[in-house]
Amino acid sequence: MRERSHPKLYWVDPGLVRAAKRQLGPVGAEERGALLEGWTLTVLRAHNEQSDLFEELSYWAPVQARETEVDFLLRKGKAYLALEVKAQPRSSPRQLSGLRAIGDLGGVVRRLALYLGNQRLRTEDGIEVWPLQAFLDALKNHKLWP
């Protein structure tokens, strides 16, 4: 499987983007996804500094599917953890297409979607859907990897 090669850019502080654009009011719906992804990256990097959470962090986007991607792909040894971030209060099957597609990649031990809802869910094909608090708890307790 070939992956697209263009990089994904994140600001160190997602609030800097808003300030640079002079968006000083309430966060708009169109901004929430990017801000939540940036926040998630910051949290992952901070935990990696303290506990060697991963050896490599990237994102995944196959060449053959333009609309398919996974926000974060963590590698530890030969194991991969795929993480998709959704700034939505509900999970839908359409939001999980990237996690479904990456299931064909060898070595993926967990496919995880984060969302703004309150329930932990699991799809029939094994994708786990967690609220943000469950993600933070897993990081704190060193349980992100299965």
Where are these regions (language model features)?
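Flexible, glycine-rich phosphate/dinucleotide-binding loops
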Residues: R18, R66, S91, R120, ...
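Intrinsically disordered, low-complexity Ser/Thr/Pro/Gly-rich regulatory segments
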Residues: L24-G25, L44, G77-K78, G106-V109, ...
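Short, charged, amphipathic alpha-helix that recurs within catalytic cores of restriction-modification
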Residues: Q88, P93-G107, R111
